[in-house]
Amino acid sequence: MKLQISNCKKAAVQDGMIGLFFEDINYAADGGLYAEMIENRSFSFVDCYGDVGDYYTKPAWGYGWNATKECGEGRLEYVTGSPISRVNPWYLRFTAQDAGQGFWNKAYDGIYLEKGKTYTVRFYARAAQYPEGDITVQVTKDGRICAQAEVSCIHAPEKTWQKWNLYEAVLEAGETIRNGRFTISLTKPGTVEFDLISMMPDDAVAGVFRKDLFDLLKGLHPGFLRFPGGCIIEGNTLENRYRWKESVGDIKDRRTNFNRWAVHLTSEENGWHTQYSHYNQTLGIGFYEYFLLCELIGAKPLPVLNVGLACQFQSYELVEMDEPEFQEFLQDAVDLIEFANGPVDSTWGSVRAKMGHPEPFGLTMVGIGNEQWQTEKIDFFGRYQAFEKAIHAKYPEIKLIGSAGPDITSERYDKAWEFYNCLLYTSDAADDL
């Protein structure tokens, strides 16, 4: 069979022009590509409410965690004072009145285990008020134990009670299950404090990415990967925006941030509060991991930067270009390029190297703004020019990707093309090529 679409020669598509866009929306990162199986692992989630110009959060430190009831209920308290990191200051103090009492995690609607595969559990704990006994880690399904490990507890004396110890256990799945329950319990009565409880499949790619989803992305052979968004770059408010510098370094020092999509579709009818109100970002996939993902799937990285604007659909907030704070946004752009490409003795290149990648990532382009457009009150074009000047003063080789707004049929779209001085090929003009 011969299929002829047209006998007119069209414009060739440049190699690398077809790629992927990744954003933590619909649990694409936390609960998705990020292989972490525990939800709210640092006891730092918040519950999100509100509407345009009036967003707010309430503490939900214990979201996803509950006491088990098989041996009577222990007591869960969420406290602060001497955490493993001041960035995420809350942690769990669990008291068992009787042996076998414990707590379980929601785990993004349940643990999935595949028979024969192994999973590594890590957590920080301290046990100054747990003079004897150990810690049991399990995954259960309908009362059946599907994977289990015993962890020997370090019984620290009272004078060293502030010292956190890192524990590790390997679980081997005895059967394949869905919607399993992750539990931790104490073998004796006592009090133990926990923080940063993690469970990862041992086949996670680079120890970060869920293998099945990673393989699907790689199989698409994308020319580029645009990340980390999307509207989460902008945030519902500038306080909620994505700050790339908070997404690099040690996992325990990455500040949990509520997800912009946690307040999507709020309305008076639902009390400005939806079923996704606890959607938070752990930043377990941060900018280092995004660059690493690009390298592993053979795609060019295309990071997108905030230009001092919160989401134009969801907020009126901005930083004026003549305010000193605007320089922070420009500096973040310049520093990002140093993080990706800079030598190991540079400020941000050294951060990359310490994370395990002394070689540069080979960044060649950055996105200036997400779905921004020009208005009477917002001079996006002026912001673009400010970023262009700041970036090209130090890195003239970097290509910049602008924004033409969120649609292709409006005046704001046409104005953007006029600004970028690009030739707009209409369908009629394309026929003549």
Regions found by a protein language model. Give the residues of each.
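Extracellular and organelle-lumenal recognition/adhesion modules and their flexible linkers in secreted
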Residues: 1-282, 300, 318-327, 377-378, ...
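Alpha-helical scaffolding within the catalytic cores
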Residues: 3-5, 76, 208-212, 285-289, ...
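Active-site beta-loop-alpha junctions enriched in small/polar residues
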Residues: 23-25, 229-232, 306-308, 368-371, ...
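Acidic-and-aromatic substrate-binding clefts and catalytic sites of carbohydrate-active enzymes
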Residues: 205-206, 280-281, 311, 344-347, ...
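Active-site groove signature of glycoside hydrolases
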Residues: 229, 312, 344-377
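Aromatic-lined carbohydrate-recognition surfaces of secreted/lumenal glycan-active proteins
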Residues: 352-353, 392-411
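Conserved small/polar residues in nucleotide/adenosyl-binding loops
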Residues: 425-432
